Amino acid sequence: MRRRSSMDINRAIRVAVDTGNVVLGTKQAIKNIKHGEGQLVIIADNCAKDVREDIFYYTQLSETPVYTHQSTSIELGAICGKPFPVSALLVLEPGNSAILNVNNEE
């Protein structure tokens, strides 16, 4: 299986935002993860350390996979088509996207 390129992942994120059900923001992502919702968490590379630790803690409890995107929160926001930074997003439903097939390099 070939390794997914950055452009493929960016496109998959955008399609998930446009056609699926995605929660943007660390607070909302953590809230939904605590309730056992969500299929994949994507966090920006520059996400704050304490927030990153909280996300990893709750995703381990709920067995939700985490993907660290190799971009800043500003770039991740732009990929999502938003005019603001996005440090984390939670995919509730992928829509027409293949985002759930992403493999984390961590």
UniProtKB/Swiss-Prot annotation:
Ranges in a coiled coil: none
Entry's Gene Ontology BP terms: translation
Pfam families per the UniProt record, alphabetical: Ribosomal_L7Ae (PF01248)
Cell membrane found in the keyword field: no
Domain of life from the UniProt record: Archaea
InterPro entries associated with the record: Ribosomal_eL30, Ribosomal_eL30-like, Ribosomal_eL30-like_sf, Ribosomal_eL30_CS, Ribosomal_eL8/eL30/eS12/Gad45
HAMAP family on file: Ribosomal_eL30
Family note: Belongs to the eukaryotic ribosomal protein eL30 family.
Protein's recorded name: Large ribosomal subunit protein eL30
Gene: rpl30e
